[in-house]
Amino acid sequence: GPNPAINGYVRSNGAAVRVIAGATSGGAALVVRQDAGISKPEDFHGKRIASPQMGNTQDVALRAWLKTHGMKTTDRGGDVQVIPAANPDQLTLFVKKQQKQSGHCLTSSSADGAWAPEPWASRLVHEASGRMFLDERELWPKRQFVTAQLVVRTCFVNQHPDLVKAWLRAHVELTDWINGHLTEAKAILNSQLQKETGRL
């Protein structure tokens, strides 16, 4: 995502990496549990929301969105708890309800929502009965934002400029072909995924 690329750039004073192409736009959403009692932004007070990793793209988006709506996370003196949880773990957190034992809730047992990239956002909806609260595209001009890009080490670009140009040319041509042949591209991708994973 963009944040690791920015971190690499900033930590090296601009010397370590170069972003040479975009790879994906969009594909992230805030999904909430059906029974979480969340229908508007202010309903997030006192809730537990998962993000894939502290400081990653979705985590930053979640924290910025909360701040925009006047909320603070618990680590900043507020009442919204952000839970760093890998995407597969979000499914588990999402379906668990807080269990009560001896009159108190067990900790780390559930999440009321998650800001997740695809395909995990859709999986939360379809496999965990979640509800799409916000498609992140709604927050961006022209509904476009970077979720992945191609980053190359600066020394590699300097040592192999022709190879980088050839790879970039192929990337652009393939992207154009996919965008012009979506049905065929999906069939090819699904066939290859089935071959690699042995699953439909």
Predicted stretch roles:
Residues 2-4, 36, 89-194:
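Pocket-lining segment of extracytoplasmic ligand-binding domains
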Residues 1-85, 91, 99-118, 133, ...:
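Short, glycine-/small- and polar/acidic-enriched structural segments
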Residues 194-200:
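Acidic/histidine-enriched active-site and ligand-binding environments that engage anionic O-linkages
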